[in-house]
A protein has these predicted regions:
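N-terminal Sec-pathway targeting helices
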Residues: 2-18
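Solvent-exposed, non-transmembrane regions of membrane-associated and secreted proteins
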Residues: 18-137
């Protein structure tokens, strides 16, 4: 009888642990996708508000209103765009490379962070090499 009670307790303890792991994993997955969605939405809003699409002789291009964009965040230094891809982001630069690892352009926390330039580089791209970081974009 004692052996059956011990097995039952062990069974429920393992079940509770597995249920806890399942719930924690579900929360982590939800958190990841929620932040990814927030990051994507903010970037789409920035692109919509601060860029103007134009067509030229050979290709479609756009202009960025840096003056208005810098009113929102003075750390904006450039815009990174690759045609026919999803890469279309403002490039930020701060005195600490860790700052934009987990922050959006509006300063809000987000695990995805932002595209940012190394703090040691000149913001006018006059260096021989410029390092640009981007994580989970």
């Amino acid at each position: 009888m004692k052996n059956k009670t011990g097995k039952k307790v062990l069974y429920y303890a393992i079940l509770a642990i597995l249920l806890g792991v399942f719930c924690f994993s579900g929360y982590q997955i939800y958190s990841y996708y929620s932040e990814q969605n927030a990051s994507t939405s903010l970037n789409e809003e920035i692109v919509r508000e601060y860029t103007i699409r134009k067509t030229g002789e050979a290709k479609e291009y756009f202009e960025v209103d840096f003056d208005q964009l810098r009113q929102q965040n003075e750390d904006v230094t450039a815009w990174l765009y690759l045609p026919d891809s999803v890469i279309n982001y403002p490039v930020l630069q701060h005195g600490d490379n860790d700052y934009y690892l987990t922050r959006q352009i509006d300063g809000s926390y987000n695990k995805n962070g932002s595209i940012f330039m190394d703090y040691r580089n000149a913001s006018d791209f006059s260096d021989r090499n410029t390092i640009i970081y981007g994580h989970h974009m």
